């Protein structure tokens, strides 16, 4: 038999299954917003718990909370951070655009845990009240955006940066011995002048290095916290100096350089910092899409494609074509990239719709940003483990393609001029002969002169 308890809010009483710790406002949200299954991300819940812990500590320092109340809030948030109550945060993203119901979900659960410890009974509003104590000096309008920023920083530090560093190291290690492998370059998907395989991969390496730099630049504004602005940015019902001390507590707890935002009106009404950060994630997706597609093309084949790289064979690729193996890690990564690009469109539209004193698209903004961080992180790590680490060059085929390329003729430009070099290339292509044979046939160069000038090893460096 299911046991229920009665909770209440300004709308009256409501029944809640007694095994859960949330209160009336959370229950109403569950009943009023049966939309989708996209729950608030775990790291956002963790960030809200950090927020409430730090707020209680500051309120205690100011003398605005009794020690017994502050201590009970601190213990409750520690238990939440220890994942003891993960099933008590059930609300979906599709709720009020300020995130008020998730903020109250956290307030109610903390108060309920604290009350159970102090009285033996979960729920209720005494001795710990979800609004008067847990939410003291706060509004959902400043708390939720603060949690959004904390969650973005933590997810980036814990997942995305390590994943990109993992990919960077893998690309560096894989290509470090490829400086002697000279291959044909391609522009417009047509043959171009030679370069080394290491040089080609150095472009990918630099893209990832720049991605890491972009993240650090974009995080600078995300470190600024809205807490202390309360309802519309004026700080009503929040003690002077609360915002500064709060940011210091969060910085100490997370070991991240959080500071209070200098203008709380901007912090509540706009989410430009997160739109910018989403733009950085979008740029990273663009970079990874280019890298993955290049590796896909270079590994195409095995017999009728470019075939310059051997990609790891991880699983059967076709239900009808025996022996077929596909570049599945590339396909997974590029699908992730398209999702991240789409997420950025959502964040852009949501960020542009901050009306007057409050942007009310907060949940969808943070949901998409955190999803982008998670997908990019997981996909980068998977790409390293199941693709990059196992890539090997097909040296024989690389050499064969290079030596057949007509674009080696570019080395002749300084010696016989562009027009004569073009004649050699066209003659070779028209009659299916080598550049050397065409040069001799047209009486433009002797074999000895040709061999002295057209040296692929010399074409991959500036003279």
UniProtKB/Swiss-Prot annotation:
The keyword Cytoplasm applies. CDD domains: Fumarase_classII. It catalyses: (S)-malate = fumarate + H2O. It comes from the Bacteria. Pathway: Carbohydrate metabolism; tricarboxylic acid cycle; (S)-malate from fumarate: step 1/1. GO terms for biological process: fumarate metabolic process; malate metabolic process; tricarboxylic acid cycle. The record marks 331 as: Important for catalytic activity. Involved in the TCA cycle. Catalyzes the stereospecific interconversion of fumarate to L-malate. Belongs to the class-II fumarase/aspartase family. Fumarase subfamily. This is Fumarate hydratase class II. It comes from Rickettsia bellii (strain RML369-C).
């Amino acid at each position: 038999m299911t046991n229920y308890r009665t909770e209440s809010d300004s709308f009256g009483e409501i029944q809640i299954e007694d095994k859960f710790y949330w209160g009336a406002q959370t229950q109403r949200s569950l009943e009023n917003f049966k939309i989708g299954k996209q729950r608030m991300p775990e790291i956002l819940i963790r960030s809200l718990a950090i927020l409430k812990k730090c707020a209680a500590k500051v309120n205690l320092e100011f003398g605005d909370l009794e020690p017994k109340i502050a201590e009970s809030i601190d213990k409750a948030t520690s238990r939440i951070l220890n994942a003891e109550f993960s099933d008590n945060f059930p609300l979906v993203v599709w709720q009020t655009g300020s995130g008020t119901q998730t903020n109250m979900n956290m307030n109610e659960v903390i108060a309920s845990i604290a009350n159970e410890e102090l009285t033996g009974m979960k729920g209720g509003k005494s001795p710990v009240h979800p609004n008067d104590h847990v939410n003291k000096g706060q509004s959902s309008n400043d708390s939720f955006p603060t949690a959004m920023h904390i969650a973005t920083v933590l997810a980036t530090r814990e997942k995305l940066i390590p994943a990109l560093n993992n990919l960077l190291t893998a690309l560096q290690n894989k290509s470090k011995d490829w400086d002697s492998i000279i291959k044909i370059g391609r522009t417009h998907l047509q043959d171009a002048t030679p370069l080394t395989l290491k040089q080609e991969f150095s472009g990918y390496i630099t893209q990832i290095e720049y991605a890491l730099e972009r993240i650090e630049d974009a995080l600078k504004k995300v470190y600024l916290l809205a807490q202390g602005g309360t309802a519309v940015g004026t700080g009503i019902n929040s003690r002077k100096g609360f915002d500064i001390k709060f940011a210091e507590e969060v910085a100490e707890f997370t070991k991240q350089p959080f500071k209070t935002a200098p203008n709380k009106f901007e912090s509540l009404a706009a989410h430009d910092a997160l739109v910018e950060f989403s733009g950085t994630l979008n740029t990273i997706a663009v970079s990874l899409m280019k890298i993955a597609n290049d590796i896909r093309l270079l590994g195409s084949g095995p017999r009728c494609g470019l075939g310059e790289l051997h990609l790891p064979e991880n699983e059967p690729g076709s239900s009808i074509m025996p022996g077929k193996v596909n570049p599945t890690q590339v396909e997974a990564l590029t699908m992730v990239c398209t999702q991240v690009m789409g997420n950025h469109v959502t964040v852009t539209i949501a960020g542009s719709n901050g009306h007057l004193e409050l942007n009310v698209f907060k949940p969808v903004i943070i949901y998409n940003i955190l999803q982008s961080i998670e997908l990019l992180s997981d996909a980068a790590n998977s790409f390293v483990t199941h693709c990059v680490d196992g890539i090997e060059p097909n040296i024989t085929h690389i050499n064969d393609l290079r030596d057949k390329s007509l674009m080696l003729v570019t080395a002749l430009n300084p010696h016989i001029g562009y027009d004569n070099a073009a004649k050699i290339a066209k003659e070779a292509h028209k009659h299916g002969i080598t550049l050397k044979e065409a040069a001799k046939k047209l009486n433009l160069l002797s074999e000895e002169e040709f061999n002295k000038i057209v040296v692929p090893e010399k074409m991959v460096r500036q003279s």
